[in-house]
Structures are given as C-alpha cells and as structure tokens.
C-alpha cells in the first residue's frame, strides 16, 4: 500500500486549492487510477487541508522463492518500484507537475497505513481533535466503494481507519471543547472584537462548516445574516439558529451591513471580489471590515487584503490559534498516538498472517487429500457396506483429524508472521510437504472442508450382482490387478466411489473431482494474499 499527497503541512493554500478534488470528480479520478495496470485499489481523500491518494498494487508480492528460482527483489529494486508507482499515482491525479512535486509527501507499506490511521484520528489535522475529518473520510470511503475501487487490503485498512478514529474519540478527550476550523475562526473573531455580542456577522454558505460557525456565532451573541446560492438552504440554516436569511443577490448589501464576514462555500471561483469590497467600503463610511475565509478553494480574492481598512484571514492564517489549541491537547494527543500505533501494529500483523494463507491452505489441502485417498480406498473395498451415517462420520473424522494434526503447526506459523526469517520457514514447510508439487486433483480435495465424502449422500452401493449384472472380472481393481488395470468396478463408478473427470474419464482412486482449489481460494478472498 502506498500514500501520495499534500496537506497544510507541506503546501500553502494557493497550491492546495488548485488541486482540490470535488466529490463529483472523485469517481472519475478513482476510475483513472485503477485503470492503471499497476494499481488494483484506490481511495482519494480531498478536504480543505489535504489531497491524499491511497493505493494498493494490483499484484501482491509473490510467494517465497522456491530453491533454484530467481532471488527476490532487493530493497533497492522494491524502492524503485514503489517510487515508480507513487509517481504514476501523482501524475494520474494531477500532482505530478514540477510546481507541485516539492510539496508532495509519500509513504509506503506500514508507514502508509500509520499515516491513514493518524489522519482518521485527527492527529494530522490543522486543528488536532477536530471531528470533521472522520465524516470526510467516511464519505471518501463511500465514494470508493461505490466506484468499486476498494479491495481486500485497502478496504480493510479504510474500515480500520474509521474504527481507529472512533476509538480515539471514545478513549481520549482529544475532541473536548470546540475544536474545528469553524471554532478557530470564531476564536479569531473574538480576538478582533473583545465581545461579539451586538456585532453583525455575515455567513456566506450553508454547509457543515458554515452550520458549525453559525451556532458558535449565535451562542456568542452575534446577530447573524446567512447568504447562500440556495435560498432554501439559507432559510433552513437561519431558521435553525435564529439568523436572517438573504438571497444571493443581496450579498453586497450584506457585506455592507456586517462587521465580520465568514465565508465557507464549495464554489470553484471567488465569491467576494475586490470590486465588490470597494463598493461596500464606500457605503460603510470608514468602518473596518474583517473577513475570514475558511473555504478551499478560497472564496475571497486575496487581493482584497490590499484595500484600506480591510483585513482578510484564510485557513493558513489560523495556525497561531491552532498552535495554542494543540498545546492544551498535548497529553490527549499522546494517548491518541499510542492508540494509533497499537492499531497500526495489529493491521500489520493481519497483513503478515494473510501472506501465510496460501501456505496454510495448501498444507490443509495436502493433508486432507492423503486422508481422503486412504478412506476412499477403504470405501471401495472392505468398507463398501457402510451406510450414510457411517460415511458422514468418516467425513467428520477426516475434518477433526486434519484440524488436530495441523493446529499446532499453523498456530506456530502464524506466530512467526513477524519473524524476519518467516520466508525461510514457509519455504521449508512447502518443500517438506511438497505443497507446490501436489497434483491438482489431490489439491482439489481441499473442498472437503465442506465435510463431504463421495457416497456420503448416495449411501452404500448396491452390489452389481443384485442388479442382475455379473460381478467384476478377476482382473478388475480390488482383485490384485495392477493399479491402472481396467475396467474399474462399475458399481464403484455408479455409486460415486470414483469421481468422473471432464470427458467421462474416471479419476484415480481416492481423488475428488471438485472445483479448482485456486478458484475456491479466490472465492474466499484469499487469492494473492
């Protein structure tokens, strides 16, 4: 898994706003990413403070090398491959230009997972502890699921990230009080006006951040005006908090009436321009105008800051207030970091154990195939008389024996998942049990995980002589003939002791003609682990 992106920590707002990806564009970007031959899964998180892409390679790492095979890729080769993949991701989403490259951050493997978890826990947010990021991440995951770009690995990482965020908010007080970009904006307003009571605040926009800001403004005693392109949304928000809704056409008049303007829309263009502010200044008769722009892309043209008696602040200007907030939450942030580290370690353990799944599946298939072959040999001979109940009991006994035989080896193998020498242990195990060399039809016996033996449903075979047919010739199997002698006992074929392969040819004794084990593994979500 890799991560490529930028945030308020690596790029100024003028860079972030150029690269912001709106929700309506996310499916297109996700499709472009997963169309790349090297990318199997993708997740895009775009907020006012970050644009981040998480991706997982289409092909997982190969199984441990067999003796005499080519050596595994070196750390240098893996690094080059990861760098190439990161470069491809950056280019596909428009982050590959020279002007942007210096602002990019990247992580690979467990470091990428750790970063994802820290973001979900709001530890990487401009305002540590802010709750909005968890909702934004849920929305990004929902879009990726809808676009079918989340698979086993990245899908699980995303799911765990949400759990991590919830756990941090439940087990720590990192989100206590008012912690969000909106709350920081109101704190700034309080610094400008010692008391907001009696002052008029204009809120441009009616989204989540605008709603949060409106409640704080009203609580502080400010008179609130709400302007939004959608009159209905403006009216709904104003009604909820006791403000005054105005149509978009009254934006300039509202700027004239306001002491402070807070803007938070999703517009791709400036909604407050220097010309609008110049006209408003004349009508304001020298009153200072304070504007706080918490939107990305920005709503207010930064050129208005050059006008007399006009003071503009954007999200990057809120950093000093944020720093004070972080200091007060240092202890809770440390507790949150410990939770994130614990969850990241657990995810890494799952990843390592998952890589062992093909070997464990192969070992169980190998063991089961041997037991099945021996039991079916007996069922075609001395135990032909067994009924349905007895055959079902044998099937259960095979399962129980397989589980008991392999419980200790598989438990210890999983415990070795984080051992640097695990590849050597796995290779030895596959060599000792000839897991890679097992005939496909023997491996197919793994389907007995369902607990079936041929004949367990059909019941005991009816002797051929009882159906009016002659008994098997002396040269038939079971009468001392060579292994490949034919014909095989017709009763055995008719009653399922021998399964038929495609084309009607009976399989070897003790072999189950069932689905390809690779397909079964794939259906179980384990292929390529």
UniProtKB/Swiss-Prot annotation:
<feature type="binding site">
    <location>
        <begin position="47"/>
        <end position="50"/>
    </location>
    <ligand>
        <name>substrate</name>
    </ligand>
</feature>
<feature type="region of interest" description="Disordered">
    <location>
        <begin position="454"/>
        <end position="505"/>
    </location>
</feature>
<feature type="binding site">
    <location>
        <begin position="130"/>
        <end position="132"/>
    </location>
    <ligand>
        <name>substrate</name>
    </ligand>
</feature>
<feature type="active site" description="Nucleophile">
    <location>
        <position position="48"/>
    </location>
</feature>
<dbReference type="GO" id="GO:0008883">
    <property type="term" value="F:glutamyl-tRNA reductase activity"/>
</dbReference>
<dbReference type="InterPro" id="IPR018214">
    <property type="entry name" value="GluRdtase_CS"/>
</dbReference>
<comment type="function">
    <text>Catalyzes the NADPH-dependent reduction of glutamyl-tRNA(Glu) to glutamate 1-semialdehyde (GSA).</text>
</comment>
<comment type="subunit">
    <text>Homodimer.</text>
</comment>
<dbReference type="InterPro" id="IPR036453">
    <property type="entry name" value="GluRdtase_dimer_dom_sf"/>
</dbReference>
<dbReference type="InterPro" id="IPR036343">
    <property type="entry name" value="GluRdtase_N_sf"/>
</dbReference>
<dbReference type="Pfam" id="PF00745">
    <property type="entry name" value="GlutR_dimer"/>
</dbReference>
<dbReference type="GO" id="GO:0019353">
    <property type="term" value="P:protoporphyrinogen IX biosynthetic process from glutamate"/>
</dbReference>
<feature type="binding site">
    <location>
        <position position="136"/>
    </location>
    <ligand>
        <name>substrate</name>
    </ligand>
</feature>
<dbReference type="Pfam" id="PF01488">
    <property type="entry name" value="Shikimate_DH"/>
</dbReference>
<feature type="binding site">
    <location>
        <begin position="205"/>
        <end position="210"/>
    </location>
    <ligand>
        <name>NADP(+)</name>
    </ligand>
</feature>
<comment type="pathway">
    <text>Porphyrin-containing compound metabolism; protoporphyrin-IX biosynthesis; 5-aminolevulinate from L-glutamyl-tRNA(Glu): step 1/2.</text>
</comment>
<dbReference type="InterPro" id="IPR015896">
    <property type="entry name" value="4pyrrol_synth_GluRdtase_dimer"/>
</dbReference>
<feature type="site" description="Important for activity">
    <location>
        <position position="115"/>
    </location>
</feature>
<dbReference type="InterPro" id="IPR006151">
    <property type="entry name" value="Shikm_DH/Glu-tRNA_Rdtase"/>
</dbReference>
<feature type="region of interest" description="Disordered">
    <location>
        <begin position="56"/>
        <end position="80"/>
    </location>
</feature>
<dbReference type="Pfam" id="PF05201">
    <property type="entry name" value="GlutR_N"/>
</dbReference>
<comment type="similarity">
    <text>Belongs to the glutamyl-tRNA reductase family.</text>
</comment>
<keyword id="KW-0560">Oxidoreductase</keyword>
<feature type="compositionally biased region" description="Low complexity">
    <location>
        <begin position="464"/>
        <end position="475"/>
    </location>
</feature>
<feature type="binding site">
    <location>
        <position position="125"/>
    </location>
    <ligand>
        <name>substrate</name>
    </ligand>
</feature>
<dbReference type="InterPro" id="IPR036291">
    <property type="entry name" value="NAD(P)-bd_dom_sf"/>
</dbReference>
<dbReference type="InterPro" id="IPR015895">
    <property type="entry name" value="4pyrrol_synth_GluRdtase_N"/>
</dbReference>
<keyword id="KW-0521">NADP</keyword>
<feature type="compositionally biased region" description="Pro residues">
    <location>
        <begin position="62"/>
        <end position="73"/>
    </location>
</feature>
<keyword id="KW-0627">Porphyrin biosynthesis</keyword>
<protein>
    <recommendedName>
        <fullName>Glutamyl-tRNA reductase</fullName>
        <ecNumber>1.2.1.70</ecNumber>
    </recommendedName>
</protein>
<dbReference type="GO" id="GO:0050661">
    <property type="term" value="F:NADP binding"/>
</dbReference>
<dbReference type="InterPro" id="IPR000343">
    <property type="entry name" value="4pyrrol_synth_GluRdtase"/>
</dbReference>
């Amino acid at each position: 898994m890799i991560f490529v992106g930028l945030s308020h920590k690596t790029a100024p707002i003028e860079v972030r706003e150029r690269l912001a990806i709106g929700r309506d564009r996310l499916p297109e970007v996700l499709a472009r990413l997963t169309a790349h031959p090297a990318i199997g899964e993708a997740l895009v998180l775009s907020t006012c403070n970050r644009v981040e892409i998480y991706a997982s390679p289409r092909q997982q790492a190969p199984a441990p090398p067999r003796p005499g095979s080519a050596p595994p890729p070196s750390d240098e080769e893996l690094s080059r491959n990861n760098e190439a993949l990161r470069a491809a991701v950056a280019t596909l989403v428009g982050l590959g230009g020279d002007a942007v490259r210096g602002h990019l951050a990247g992580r690979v493997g467990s470091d990428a997972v750790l970063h994802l978890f820290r973001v979900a826990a709001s530890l990487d947010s401009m305002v540590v502890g802010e709750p909005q990021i968890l909702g934004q991440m849920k929305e990004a995951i929902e879009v990726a699921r809808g676009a079918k770009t989340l698979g086993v690995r990245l899908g699980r990482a995303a799911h765990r990230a949400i759990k991590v965020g919830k756990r941090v908010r439940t087990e720590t007080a990192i989100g206590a009080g008012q912690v969000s970009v909106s709350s920081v904006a109101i704190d700034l307003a309080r610094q400008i006006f010692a008391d907001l009571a009696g002052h008029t605040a204009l809120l441009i926009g009616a989204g989540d951040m605008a709603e949060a800001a409106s409640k704080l403004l009203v609580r502080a005693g400010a008179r609130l005006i709400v302007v939004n392109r959608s009159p209905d949304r403006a009216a709904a928000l104003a009604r909820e908090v006791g403000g005054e809704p105005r149509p978009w056409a009254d934006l300039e008049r509202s700027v004239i009436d306001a002491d402070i303007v807070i803007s938070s829309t999703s517009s791709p263009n400036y909604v407050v321009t220097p010309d609008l502010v110049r006209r408003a200044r004349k009508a304001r008769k020298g009153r200072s105008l304070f504007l706080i722009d918490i939107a990305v892309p920005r709503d207010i043209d930064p050129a208005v800051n050059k006008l007399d008696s006009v003071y503009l602040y954007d999200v990057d200007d809120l950093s000093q207030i944020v720093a004070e907030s972080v200091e007060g939450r240092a202890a809770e942030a440390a507790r949150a970091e410990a939770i994130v580290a614990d969850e990241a370690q657990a995810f890494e353990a799952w990843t390592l154990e998952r890589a062992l799944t093909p070997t464990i599946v192969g070992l169980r298939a190998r063991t089961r195939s041997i037991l099945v072959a021996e039991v079916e040999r007996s069922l075609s001979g001395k135990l032909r008389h067994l009924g349905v109940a007895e055959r079902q009991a044998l099937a259960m006994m095979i399962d129980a024996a397989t589980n008991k035989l392999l419980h200790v080896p598989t438990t210890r193998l999983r415990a070795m998942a984080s051992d640097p020498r695990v590849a050597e242990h796995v290779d030895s195990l596959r060599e000792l049990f000839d897991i890679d060399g097992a005939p496909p039809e023997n491996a197919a016996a793994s389907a007995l995980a369902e607990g079936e033996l041929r004949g367990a449903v059909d019941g005991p075979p009816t002797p051929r002589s009882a159906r009016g047919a002659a008994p098997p010739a002396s040269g038939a199997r079971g009468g001392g003939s060579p292994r490949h002698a034919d014909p095989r006992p017709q009763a055995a074929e008719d009653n399922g002791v021998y399964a038929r392969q495609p084309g009607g040819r009976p399989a070897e004794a003790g072999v189950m003609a069932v689905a390809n084990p690779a397909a079964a593994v794939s259906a179980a979500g384990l292929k390529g682990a």
